């Protein structure tokens, strides 16, 4: 609902969704098993043209899949400059 609503609002040459970055995630992949190894994360919006949508990025089996690296990436896209967040010291390059 919220993504459709933001996409319906014009903001200059883009929509409000194009200029927004929303993240939704869960702290469990499979709640019945309490599996927190593969967390489902959805990032919606274009961040003012700073992120490319329409992709699935799968970090299964990759050591660089720290969630805090995603947060660093998102902060970087919003011009919030920091070198660390939680246990992460660099953003995810693919975001």
Question: What would you call each of these model-derived segments?
Answer:
Residues 1-95:
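Feature marks hydrolase-like catalytic cores characterized by long aromatic- and Gly/Pro-rich stretches
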């Amino acid at each position: 609902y919220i993504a459709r609503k933001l996409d319906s609002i014009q903001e200059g040459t883009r929509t409000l969704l194009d200029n927004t970055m929303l993240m939704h995630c869960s702290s469990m992949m499979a709640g019945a098993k309490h599996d927190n190894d593969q967390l489902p994360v959805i990032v919606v919006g274009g961040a003012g043209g700073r992120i490319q949508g329409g992709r699935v990025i799968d970090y299964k089996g990759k050591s660089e899949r720290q969630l805090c690296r995603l947060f660093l990436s998102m902060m970087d896209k919003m011009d919030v400059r920091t070198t660390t967040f939680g246990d992460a010291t660099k953003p995810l390059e693919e975001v």
